[in-house]
Amino acid sequence: MKDKIVLAYSGGLDTSVAVQWLIDKGYDVVACCLDVGEGKDLDVVYQKALDMGAVECHIIDATKEFSDDYVSYAIKGNLMYENAYPLVSALSRPLIAKKLVEIAEKTNSIGIAHGCTGKGNDQVRFEVAIKALNPKLKAFAPVREWAWSREEEIDYAIKHNIPVSINYDSPYSIDQNLWGRANECGILEDPYAAPPEDAFDLTTPLEETPDNADEIILTFKQGIPVQVDGKDYQLDDLILYLNQLAGKHGIGRIDHVENRMVGIKSREIYETPGAEVILKAHKALETITLTKDVAHFKPVIEKQFSEQIYNGLWFSPLTDSLKLFIDSTQQYVEGDVRIKLFKGNAIVNGRQSPYTLYDEKLATYTKEDAFNQESAVGFIDIYGLPTQVNALLHGGYSNEQ
């Protein structure tokens, strides 16, 4: 009886070739494909896995779990790796690993295989997550082991009659889920080359976007968007709706050269229309609902949290602690944010909250002003006292310093 290996199967080039490669190595392949909101035809993927030679294929709709348990933290934590990348692919990897482990345990498989290369981040994310969830399972990385070039891999696929939607002229590597779309390889590997329009799918070119803006109101409850223009949405449906609406206006294109875990720089093209709108609105609401010290400290946690996810450490004690902190800040992040969508921009035009810390009577310069300006004298004296003492001791600062 052959040993079974669960393969994270997408139906793309790498994993389709991996099925045949693992079979050649003497294993029975149990394919597993997750839907995390990419809109893929899973019936086609299911049949393709079996046609490739997999003995089983498990299709799992994890879109709602992805939005509620993972994307929700990206929103509450304003998560952006290197202040640019909203963790599109990285955010889905721990969930995918979790489901792969469940299937491996259910089918008595000896290990889990993935289609990641030896120079990417995902190999680390998957294998570290698998070790955290079930350290007895072995990890297999066919693409890393065969070390073929993209062209050699395509040749192998053609030789074994493996259908792939990729060619020598357009060898993009695409990953998509509810939170956005990531694209790399091909001409995109030249960081100076402008991305051609065929590298994009979720967003309209600026030249073709509507000449009239759309203005929407996002309503948040405990840091999570729950309504658009007064209409209730589940989080996954809300993101999909905003992907379509904001994408129509060309919002959410990101051209980023990022620092990978393995030490190289990689040029990535991301499309995150819904994410950009939600994150901008969420940050705007936090400006009136968080105290000054929390607002100033939270970005420190956000940066660490983003790096934990990017570096494949979702299942770790530190990440658990960071999640608790983020949750504790969101109790009063509730209210409405008005945001205009126009020509590639998501523009915040207003925000309100029943828990606002913004007091118009204290902020105004009209006759309604309730701020006691006489208090400023004593405040300045106390606040400036260390500076004054230092200046008296050392003779003050000269204009040349």
Curated annotation (Swiss-Prot):
Bridged cysteine pairs (disulfide): none
Sequence positions that bind L-citrulline: Y85, N121, R125, S173, E258, Y270
One Gene Ontology cellular component: cytoplasm
Keyword ATP-binding among UniProt keywords: yes
Binding positions (ATP): A8, Y9, S10, G11, G12, L13, D14, T15, S16, G115
Pathway where it operates: Amino-acid biosynthesis; L-arginine biosynthesis; L-arginine from L-ornithine and carbamoyl phosphate: step 2/3
GO biological process: argininosuccinate metabolic process; L-arginine biosynthetic process; urea cycle
Keywords linked to the UniProt accession: Amino-acid biosynthesis, Arginine biosynthesis, ATP-binding, Cytoplasm, Ligase, Nucleotide-binding
GO MF assignments: argininosuccinate synthase activity; ATP binding
Binding residue positions for L-aspartate: T117, N121, D122
Reaction(s) this enzyme catalyzes, per UniProt: L-citrulline + L-aspartate + ATP = 2-(N(omega)-L-arginino)succinate + AMP + diphosphate + H(+)
Enzyme Commission numbers on file: 6.3.4.5
Enzyme type, top EC level: ligase
Pfam families: Arginosuc_syn_C, Arginosuc_synth
Cell compartment(s), UniProt: Cytoplasm
Oligomer and partners: Homotetramer.
Record-stated family: Belongs to the argininosuccinate synthase family. Type 1 subfamily.
HAMAP family the record matches: Arg_succ_synth_type1
Annotated protein name in UniProt: Argininosuccinate synthase
